[in-house]
Amino acid sequence: MADSLITLMIDGVPVSVAPGTLVIEAAKQAGVLVPHYCYHPGLPVAGVCRMCLVEIEKAPKLQIACATAVTEGMVVKTQSAPAKDARKSVLEFLLINHPLDCPICDQAGEGELQDFVFQEGRSGTRYGEYAKRFNPVEDFGPDVLYVPNRCILCTRCVRFMDDVAQEPVLNVSERGDRAFIGIHPEARLDHPWAGNVVDLCPVGSLLSKDFLHKARAWELDKTASICTGCSQGCSITLDTRDEVVVRVRPRPNLDVNRYFICDHGRANYRWMNRGDRIEAPLVKRDGELHATDWDEAFARVLGILRGASGKAVALVSAGASVEALSLAKRLLSTFQWTGAFQVVMGEEAPLAGVPNLALRAERAPNAKGAEQLGYTRDYAAAVKAAESAAVVLVLDDPDCPVQTAGALIYAGTVLPPETACRAAQVVLPIANVAEEEGTFVNRDGRAQQYFQAKPAPGMARPAAWVLGELAAALGVAEVA
């Protein structure tokens, strides 16, 4: 493998990369970030912004790092005087028309133009305010606004819709200093993956209506997580402000979702902030549920489990973590247990330009993990079996239509409706996916970890902690 690598020097640092690697990517391995706007590793190369100009020894002129492949023995200088002067000039041209509205721009603190102006740009401009443009904001789609005054025509959005989404509704209209991003007059940016143009935009020209004016970038806490919208298992970042999830963004994962997420997953966070959460354990007294502490709730559950025998049924959510599902199985291991999960189905929406990436019809982030642990998809049969079971455990499935002659234990984030699990003897408050650490297994069998982004409300705890404490107190051994 090492024999097939190409070795070059970038700012005096030797780097070995695979043949065909672009200079801009090789520079990253040397710890050098070459400024760029039009280039994105998930899009076809355009080479239109000219911001990534570097000096290459023996080349007759400066080269763009985003479209130049490495060669053996190449010597690249990203910080030479000619390269830096050229990038300063490019930035000066880009800023001729760009408005100075960083204080009101939603992308302030995250804008690549802002970053590279500080890193590479001149301290002043030779052009007056007369050069600024004043064009109205356009409504491109259900969640996308276009602010043409900020656009630098990097064409990332056009290339995404053309080559990745393969729905060519955007274009560069007009020419020269009158050019702007246009949309087909009869089209809307309503493709199931259209929200990615907002993530791709380096200057705050394309904005999400959902996130508009919600927070500044420096106010956000960012946490690595896994999307719960379907069984694809896309890597995401949860952005929280004051312990409230305000935005979901894609996190690069070349094996699962590359650099993108669908709009369904992007909007799949509001339930994480629900205000009707269960904040304390509840136990049934005189036919009514009453708040209590964990000690009494655990004592009630342990009394039920120790006093029962025969069949037990676990009706679980396919959004529960591997850890929680494993501990639920362990907790019921002394019974003849049956476990099942329900899968909500929806419409599948593939991203045409990326193989094996789609919003899956199966809206179940951990269905594969549940199956690997012995839970089945025959939910109706399990609900039927629950009617005669000694113990029924419902895990985060508030709409479960269970009726049982035995004892019902419900662990969930919200209270079930009157027609579902209100017959429970004990209700255990648990954290949702944004409030715990855990593991999901996606449809391809890939186990992926997610992390806690905010605290759980009140006395709610992660399901794995609750079930683990009960299993330990019951003295049941781990099960395979």
Where are these regions (language model features)?
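Non-catalytic alpha/beta scaffold blocks inside enzyme catalytic domains
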Residues: 307-308, 331, 335-480
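A basic, amphipathic helix-loop patch mediating RNA/tRNA/ribosome contacts
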Residues: 23-57
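Cofactor-/ligand-binding subdomain signature composed of acidic, glycine-rich
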Residues: 128, 136, 241-310, 355, ...
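Fe-S ferredoxin-like electron-transfer domains
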Residues: 50-228, 232-236, 241-245
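Gly/Ser/Thr-rich loops at beta-strand to alpha-helix junctions
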Residues: 313-324, 398-400
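Residues forming the flavin
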Residues: 2-11, 19, 25-26, 30, ...
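Short, structural beta-strand-to-alpha-helix junction motif
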Residues: 21-25, 321, 462
